[in-house]
Curated annotation (Swiss-Prot):
Record-listed Phosphoserine modification sites: 1313
Bias-annotated ranges (Basic residues): 1208-1228
Name of the protein this chain belongs to: Glutamate receptor ionotropic, NMDA 2D
GO biological process, one term: monoatomic cation transmembrane transport
Span(s) of short sequence motif PDZ-binding: 1321-1323
Protein's organism: Mus musculus
Region (Pore-forming): 628-647
Biased composition (Basic and acidic residues): 931-940
Catalytic reactions on record: Ca(2+)(in) = Ca(2+)(out); Na(+)(in) = Na(+)(out); K(+)(in) = K(+)(out)
Tissue expression profile of the protein: Detected in neonate brain synaptosomes (at protein level).
GO molecular function, one term: transmitter-gated monoatomic ion channel activity involved in regulation of postsynaptic membrane potential
Gene of this entry: Grin2d
Family: Belongs to the glutamate-gated ion channel (TC 1.A.10.1) family. NR2D/GRIN2D subfamily.
């Protein structure tokens, strides 16, 4: 090898001068070639003298014959190697130095090869000193004492073929890491190099990724005695001990350890240093190794030696001579000659010359081995072996170290067997396995540390049973195994107490018999290459004939896996949440049946709509039909805000409430289940088993179904035995491994994969994207299990069965299944959530409807019983008045309307002016369409901007009673009262309101469609009043008021015959009227009624403050008129009837007048009592008070100037007319005869009234007009009073305050209040 400072380099001249000086100083200058004599100068080989020094008498016999053998073994081009053997007898360091110096001074040598028996630990420092002093290369071929050399002398060329202490520790720590022996203690004596030993340990543990547990260092004194040494060794509890000591010190240390019980099974000793060479043997295999005192070494001792520790002496010496020869050859190639080195130990130190020569020995190769040395003189890549002392005290190679890689023979002690127990053939098992996730998972070792993680077990792909494999033999590849079955194996080894060696089968199969030969794991057990086989090994009949199986630890079978295919949303996906049976049951059965049930209950209810038809009171009115019932139930199901008509009967309402609850459940279930069907559906094929037609006849499908399995397994065996046609078809689609089959499924090249259920379920749960699914949520066919295969009649079967049953009982198997067999994909939940709801799921709500129908029948019967029988037994009560007052008070508190201003004191009485009729208005135009709710609110609030004639006091009383709500039927007039002057005349004519559309039919008393008003004179026998002149209309007060009128009869031409105007002069154009002779025009229709003022002649304490709200002036401004024999109080009232009608107690509760205004009389005030109605009776059923029917004590103003006939005369009685005995009750047509003015007999304390003709549903049970004898007195809550202050009476009769106070016996007023409250809640 050419160095950097060759002759042609920049330092060539300086080196040439150095070489010339050395040549001149040499004692043999004639043999040194010149600079140009490369290759031998004269053509001959240059002689190379190498001294072979043996220290010890053991080498005396062999030293004489080593020279020729070494010279023949080492041949170097251009050099003539001449070994010279010398034997040193002295063993002490002084004798060794003197002998070496004398030898070197008498010989011309170029190098020294040293061999010793390591009895002199100080040999290495002496050799290192001599090399530095003389610049001679010295090679120690046996190691021995050279291992303790540290640090090295400067300029020394002392080389060692053995390994250093640091290199030995590196190999030892690899062994500890391989077996997970991480806890250890260092034991040393004070031998040379012990400090370096401890420092090397600190360096290796601190910089490692392994969690080493260094429990300390013990420094022993071998001369202290065994008791002291034993106590020191027991002071640290560690089963792994690293010992560094001299050979003579090892005997007392091991004796003390044996006495302390720290040797033998359970404890491992690693020895570092030259202590094991020589002594009781030369290391030859089979020869017992003894300590110097004859004591044997403990079994299980580990040591690290050089790879040539078993080579003979000639080979070891030849290796050292070859190192010197290769270095001299490189030096000769660079300089052309071999320099003479120093031979005088007492001469001056030549350190600079040694530094320049050392580099020629850095890269040397001989016999295909690397002998390159580092700066410390040790081999860079030594070949080392790990040896272990067996029970028969022989050394066995258990591992090798080459190229920084450790290879061990497995097992020494099983990692998961009894800890550190020596290998016992009777308790050691060879276990075969096969990779298949998740049962056996094979991974490479850690690339950084080269070891397996703690939850895995080392396993080999090839088992090597030889003790010392040849160098060219294939070595097993180190792998790491983990998984479900590996965890079971570890628990079995710990519970039963055996060690094991785990390896992977070479053919990668479970086991199948091919040409009479079994392969796979079954073949390994059957041919006794393995003691046990564990993995995903299915138990079947064919395998059970040749091997024994343990009890199954995993239940499995055959399953089918497919891939999800993307689909589209079906057009009928919105119907998928329910099955067809549920839809039919819902809309055909339930909706129809419940609708008919509600209709029947409503039709037969005492308060239902059919009541008007049955009694003939409301012909042509609103009815609750089957169509409306179905529409109501349909709207409740889908929660639509559509106009509906609600039933009024209690039974019908209960049924509707139950249906609403049913609709909530039905709609909520539909909404919750709809999302699973509206998403993009994924198609998953389904089969019933291996006998399904899709597997047995795949060609009949288009495209044909492609399915397969993994051959040579139990699945294929089952299919081949039971379904041969199916097996012959699927052979073309079989896959070599499970992973490849899953890839084919995802790629669409395979439609179905048949395999073990346990493996497929795990793969489906662990699949990325959850695209793979087992058919039927893991449905298993041909159920079986996984077991452990053993030899026939194996003694391990019973212990393994008992241990597995214990694991099953302790739920350890279940815990392992959750750990290894679970995943993130859960197909079961998805299928359950997307299933249709059938009749069984919705049976509860249908049963609820049936029960509700049964309960409704009971309520229906009770309702009729109460209405027809029990209600007549109930007496009057004040509870309803209290509840009504409380309800109205709560409404007033919750109302946002401002409180009305306080009432003003009543003004003094003023004379009433003569009434005047306003001019007729043209017919109203068509009313614009207004929604029902908005129209109702507008009609309620229209009167807020107007007030009654006579001032604000009238409105204050109205607002105090009703709160913010003002019904249209009681509107405060079309215009406010005009301010009056001093004469009491109005200053301007009143304003009118725009026409209003009739209200919709919210309640029973609201008309759906109003017929046209009959024209003037339509009623025979009732003359129409003469129309006042237009000029007088402007000066007269506000129009008169009347009771609300409701008529649902056909139009006037078909209902009332038109009378002769001459016989009815008051209907327009009579002789006595101001408009006589004028053509009769159709009267204009009114959109809203005029304001009405009512008086209560029997005030109650609750109405006392309302009684003072109006004075005489206010009453004077009312100017009402009442014509005794005409249903319309004045001519202008021929407009349209009002759109709202109110109950009697509402009308009677609002008083526009004052009790104090009545003119004083000497006696008690006379009352005008009669039966009041919500609507004006059609003629002749009307309430009237004739002029001559007034009491003589009443004050009456003069009649109007346009009134015809004699002046009115006073009458003593006023009452309700008795129905005509010959006129049917259902008829509304008036006869042509003159009106009947009934006279009633006055009794003490009251008036005897004839029975009335009820015309309204609210008054059908009015008890104020008894149907008994005429002598029955009108008393109690049915008394109604009306004061008639004018000669023509004040106005239509109204109920009194007593009717509000006593409502218990008046069903009509209770209904009217309920209707009024319902309308209040709507608005």
């Amino acid at each position: 090898m050419r160095g950097a400072g060759g002759p042609r380099g920049p330092r060539g001249p300086a080196k040439m001068l150095l070489l010339l000086a050395l040549a001149c100083a040499s004692p043999f200058p004639e043999e040194v070639p010149g600079p140009g004599a490369a290759g031998g100068g004269t053509g001959g080989a240059r002689p190379l003298n190498v001294a072979l020094v043996f220290s010890g008498p053991a080498y005396a016999a062999e030293a004489a014959r080593l020279g020729p053998a070494v010279a023949a073994a080492v041949r170097s081009p251009g050099l003539d190697v001449r070994p010279v053997a010398l034997v040193l007898n002295g063993s002490d360091p002084r004798s060794l130095v003197l002998q070496l110096c004398d030898l070197l001074s008498g010989l011309r040598v170029h190098g020294v090869v040293f061999e010793d028996d390591s009895r002199a630990p100080a040999v290495a420092p002496i050799l290192d000193f001599l090399s530095a002093q003389t610049s001679l290369p010295i090679v120690a071929v046996h190691g021995g004492a050279a291992l303790v050399l540290t640090p090295k002398e400067k300029g020394s060329t002392f080389l060692q073929l053995g390994s250093s202490t640091e290199q030995q520790l590196q190999v030892i720590f690899e062994v500890l890491e391989e077996y997970d022996w991480t806890s250890f203690v260092a034991v040393t004596t004070r031998a040379p190099g012990h400090r370096a030993f401890l420092s090397y340990i600190e360096v290796l543990t601190d910089g490692s990724l392994v969690g080493w547990e260094h429990r300390g260092a013990l420094t022993l004194d071998p001369g202290a005695g065994e008791a002291v040494l034993g106590a020191q060794l027991r002071s640290v509890s560690a089963q792994i001990r690293l010992l560094f000591c001299a050979r003579e010190e090892a005997e007392p240390v091991f004796r003390a350890a044996e006495e302390a019980g720290l040797t033998g099974p359970g404890y491992v000793w690693f020895m570092v240093g030259p202590q094991l060479a020589g002594g009781g043997g030369s290391g030859v295999p089979g020869e017992p190794l003894l300590l110097p005192g004859g004591a044997p070494l403990p079994a299980g001792l580990f040591a690290v030696r050089s790879a040539g520790w078993r080579d003979d002496l000639a080979r070891r010496v030849a290796a050292g001579v070859a190192v010197v020869a290769r270095g001299a050859q490189a030096l000769l190639r660079d300089y052309g000659f071999l320099p003479e080195l120093g031979h005088d130990c007492r001469a001056q130190n030549r350190t600079h010359r040694g530094e320049s020569l050392h580099r020629y020995f850095m890269n040397i190769t001989w016999d295909n081995r690397d002998y390159s040395f580092n700066e410390d003189g040790f081999l860079v890549n030594p070949s080392l072996v790990v040896i272990s002392l067996t029970r028969d005290r022989t050394w066995e190679v258990v591992g090798s170290w080459e190229q920084q890689t450790l290879r061990l023979k497995y097992p020494l002690w099983s990692r998961y067997g009894r800890f550190l127990q020596p290998v016992d053939d009777t308790q050691h098992l060879t276990v075969a396995t096969l990779e298949e996730r998740p049962f056996v998972i094979v991974e490479p070792a850690d690339p950084i540390s080269g070891t397996c993680i703690r939850d895995s077990v080392p396993c080999r792909s090839q088992l090597n049973r030889t003790h010392s494999p040849p160098p060219d033999a294939p070595r097993p590849e180190k792998r790491c195994c983990k998984g479900f079955c590996i965890d079971i194996l570890k628990r079995l080894a710990h519970t039963i107490g055996f060690s094991y060696d785990l390896y992977l089968v070479t053919n990668g199969k479970h086991g199948k018999k091919i040409d009479g030969v079994w392969n796979g794991m079954i073949g390994e057990v059957f041919y006794q290459r393995a003691d046990m086989a564990i993995g995903s090994l299915t138990i079947n009949e064919e395998r059970s004939e040749i091997v024994d199986f343990s009890v199954p630890f995993v239940e499995t079978g055959i399953s089918v896996m497919v891939a999800r295919s993307n689909g589209t949303v079906s057009p009928s996906a919105f119907l998928e949440p329910y099955s067809p049976a549920v839809w039919v049951m819902m809309f055909v059965m339930c909706l129809t049946v419940v609708a008919v049930t509600v209709f029947i209950f409503e039709y037969l209810s005492p308060v239902g709509y059919n009541r008007s038809l049955a009694t003939g009171k409301r012909p042509g009115g609103s009815t609750f039909t089957i169509g409306k019932s179905i529409w109501l139930l349909w709207a409740l199901v889908f929660n639509n805000s559509v106009p509906v008509e609600n039933p009024r009967g209690t039974t019908s309402k209960i049924m509707v409430l139950v249906w609403a609850f049913f609709a909530v459940i039905f709609l909520a279930s539909y909404t919750a289940n709809l999302a699973a069907f509206m998403i993009q559906e994924e198609y998953v094929d389904t089969v019933s088993g291996l006998s399904d037609r899709k597997f047995q006849r795949p060609q009949e499908q288009y495209p044909p179904l492609k399915f397969g399995t993994v051959p040579n397994g139990s699945t294929e065996k089952n299919i081949r035995s039971n379904y041969p046609d199916m097996h012959s078809y699927m052979v073309r689609y079989n896959q070599p491994r499970v992973e490849e089959a899953l890839t084919q499924l995802k790629a669409g090249k395979l439609d179905a994969f048949i395999y073990d259920a346990a493996v497929l379920n795990y793969m489906a749960r662990k699949d990325e994207g959850c695209k793979l699914v087992t058919i039927g949520s893991g449905k298993v066919f041909a159920t079986t299990g996984y077991g452990i295969a053993l030899h026939k009649g194996s003694r391990w079967k019973r212990p393994i069965d008992l241990a597995l049953l214990q694991f099953l009982g302790d739920d350890e198997i279940e815990m392992l299944e959750r750990l290894w067999l679970s995943g993130i994909c859960h197909n079961d939940k998805i299928e359950v959530m997307s299933s249709k709801l059938d009749i069984d799921n919705m049976a509860g709500v249908f049963y609820m409807l049936l029960v509700a129908m049964g309960l409704s029948l009971l309520v229906f019967a009770w309702e009729h019983l109460v209405y027809w029988r029990l209600r007549h037994c109930l007496g009057p009560t004040h509870r309803m008045d209290f509840l009504l007052a409380f309800s109205r008070g709560m409404y007033s508190c919750c109302s946002a309307e401002a409180a009305p201003p306080p009432a003003k004191p009543p003004p003094p009485p003023q004379p009433l002016p003569s009434p005047a009729y306003p001019a007729a208005r043209p017919p109203p135009g068509p009313a614009p369409f207004v929604p029902r709710e908005r129209a109702a609110a507008d009609r309620w609030r229209r009167a807020k901007g107007t007030g009654p004639p006579g001032g604000a006091a009238l409105a204050d009383g109205f607002h105090r009673y009703y709160g913010p709500i003002e019904p249209q039927g009681l509107g405060l007039g079309e215009a406010r009262a005009a301010p009056r002057g001093a004469a009491g005349r109005p200053l301007s004519p009143p304003t009118t309101q725009p026409p209003q559309k009739p209200p919709p039919s919210y309640f029973a008393i609201v008309r759906e469609q109003e017929p046209a008003e009959p024209p003037a004179g339509a009623f025979p026998g009732f003359p129409s009043p003469p129309a006042p002149p237009a000029a007088a209309a402007a000066a007269v007060g506000p129009p008169l008021c009347r009771l609300a009128f409701e008529d649902e009869s056909p139009p006037a031409p078909s209902r009332w015959p038109r009378s002769d105007p001459e016989s009815q002069p008051l209907l327009g154009g009579g002789a006595g009227g101001p408009s006589a002779g004028a053509p009769t025009a159709p009267p204009p229709r009114r959109a809203a009624p005029p304001p009405c003022a009512y008086l209560d002649l029997e005030p109650s304490p609750s109405d006392s403050e309302d009684s003072e709200s109006l004075g005489g002036a206010s009453l004077g401004g009312l100017e009402p008129w009442w014509f005794a024999d005409f249903p319309y109080p004045y001519a202008e009232r021929l407009g349209p009837p009002p759109g709202r009608y109110w109950s009697v107690d509402k009308l009677g509760g609002w008083r526009a007048g004052s009790w104090d205004y009545l003119p004083p009389r000497g006696g008690p005030a006379w009352h005008c009592r009669h039966c009041a109605s919500l609507e004006l009776l059609p003629p002749p059923r009307h309430l009237s008070c004739s002029h001559d029917g007034l009491d003589g004590g009443w004050w009456a103003p003069p009649p109007p100037p346009w009134a015809a006939g004699p002046p009115p005369r006073r009458r003593a009685r006023c009452g309700c007319p008795r129905p005509h005995p010959h006129r049917p009750r259902a008829s509304h047509r008036a006869p042509a005869a003159a009106p009947h003015h009934h006279r009633h007999r006055r009794a003490a304390g009251g008036w005897d009234l004839p029975p009335p003709a009820p015309t309204s549903r609210s008054l059908e049970d009015l008890s104020s007009c008894p149907r008994a004898a005429p002598t029955r007195r009108l008393t109690g809550p049915s008394r109604h009073a009306r004061r008639c202050p004018h000669a023509a009476h004040w106005g239509p009769p109204l109920p009194t305050a007593s009717h509000r106070r006593h409502r218990g016996g008046d069903l009509g007023t209770r209904r009217g209040s309920a209707h009024f409250s319902s309308l209040e809640s709507e608005v």
